[in-house]
């Protein structure tokens, strides 16, 4: 189970700790995700903005139950936010943020990148190499696995989110995902 811990800077998810404890109490593995807001709003530079978001995530993680799964960086647009950064700037932001969590010695703990193929291909330069260091969590709502094509820069998805209409012991919808058993 992945639990949202924050979005941008200054917006921690107040339910993250309770959600994590409840999931652990029910025997579930947990991981956390940060909804990235790649822009220049913090100190007016890409690097300082990404650093501010990463630093806040690191602080938030110290007060939460230990994760069983790697951190995930959620990259998507919403009705209220879509990054205006050019592709090279967007890549710089993503690489700066992820550098705070990258472990070359233990790559299985490196963060995942979550996003839709179309969004990632629009925001990132086509020649980026993020897929060599970070696994892709692909959001593609279809029940046809052949249509779950990874974004440029990745040769396969690690996790595929195929629906947002799952309901299992909750009051609302849950996202449904498949994880590759082997990479």
Could you tell me what each predicted segment is?
Residues 41-49, 119-130:
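Glycine-rich, charge-decorated loop segments at or immediately adjacent to ligand/cofactor-binding or catalytic sites
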Residues 83-86, 122-127, 171:
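A short secondary-structure junction signal
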Residues 1-3, 31, 133-139:
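Short hydrophobic/aromatic-enriched beta-strand-loop microsegments
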Residues 34, 115, 140:
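Short beta-strand/turn micro-motifs composed of small residues
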Residues 2-103, 108:
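Substrate-binding cleft of extracellular glycoside hydrolase catalytic domains
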Residues 106-122, 135, 159:
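Aromatic-lined carbohydrate-recognition surfaces of secreted/lumenal glycan-active proteins
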Residues 127-183:
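Functionally critical loop-and-helix segments that line ligand-binding/catalytic clefts
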Residues 3, 73-75, 113, 138, ...:
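Conserved beta-strand positions
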